C-alpha cells in the first residue's frame, strides 16, 4: 500500500511540474537547437541551406520544401497543452493535420502530428527510432527570436 501511495504522489508531482511550464507563443522554435544561431546570423537564407524546421505560432511550421499553416490554436485553463488545426503542404501534396503541442522543459516543446503518426503506423514513413513515438518532433525555443530576420 505504501508503494502505491508513493507511486501516485510521484505521478501527481510530475503532472504539477508540467503544469508550471508555459509555451511562449511569441518566440520561434527550431527542430535543431544549433539553428537558432544560424537563423540569427543568416535570417531566411538559413532555411535554404539548413536541414531543420522552424515553428512560430504566427507562421506555422516551415522549412525549405514544407509548410504547415496554423488555422486554430486552442488551449484550456489549467493545462499547458495546445491543440492545433493545420493545413500542410509539401511538393505535390496538401493535407489537413491536427497537432498536439506540449512543453517538455523550460525551452523545449513536443509537437505530435496525427498525419505523421498515421504515416508511420501504416508503413509509409520509417519509424523515428525505438525511443521516440511516431509523429513526434521536439523543438527548441530561440530566446532571441520572435520572427525570422529578413535582410
Feature roles, as predicted:
Residues 12-14:
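N-terminal signal peptide c-region/cleavage motif recognized by signal peptidases
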Residues 35-39, 67-69, 87-89, 141-143:
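Sequence contexts marking disulfide-bonded cysteines in secreted/extracellular proteins
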Residues 19-20, 26, 30-59, 63, ...:
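Short, solvent-exposed loop/hinge segments that bridge or flank secondary-structure elements
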Residues 1-8:
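Sec-dependent signal peptide recognition
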Residues 115-151:
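Edge beta-strand at a domain terminus
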Residues 97-124:
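Helix-rich interaction surfaces within compact, conserved domain-sized segments
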Residues 59-106:
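Contiguous, well-ordered beta-strand patches that form the walls/edges
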Residues 42-48, 75-81, 95-99, 133-134, ...:
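Extracellular/mature segments of secreted proteins
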Amino acid at each position: 500500500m505504501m508503494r502505491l501511495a508513493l507511486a501516485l504522489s510521484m505521478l501527481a508531482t510530475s503532472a504539477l511540474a508540467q503544469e508550471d511550464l508555459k509555451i511562449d507563443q511569441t518566440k520561434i522554435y527550431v527542430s535543431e537547437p544549433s539553428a537558432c544561431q544560424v537563423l540569427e546570423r543568416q535570417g531566411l537564407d538559413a532555411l535554404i541551406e539548413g536541414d531543420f524546421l522552424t515553428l512560430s505560432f504566427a507562421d506555422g511550421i516551415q522549412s525549405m520544401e514544407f509548410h504547415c499553416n496554423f488555422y486554430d490554436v486552442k488551449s484550456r485553463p489549467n493545462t499547458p497543452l495546445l491543440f492545433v488545426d493545420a493545413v500542410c503542404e509539401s511538393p505535390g501534396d496538401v493535407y489537413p493535420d491536427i497537432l498536439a503541442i506540449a512543453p517538455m522543459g523550460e525551452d523545449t516543446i513536443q509537437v505530435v502530428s496525427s498525419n505523421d503518426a498515421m504515416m508511420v503506423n501504416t508503413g509509409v514513413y520509417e519509424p523515428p527510432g525505438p525511443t521516440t513515438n511516431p509523429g513526434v518532433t521536439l523543438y527548441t525555443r530561440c530566446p532571441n527570436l520572435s520572427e525570422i530576420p529578413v535582410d
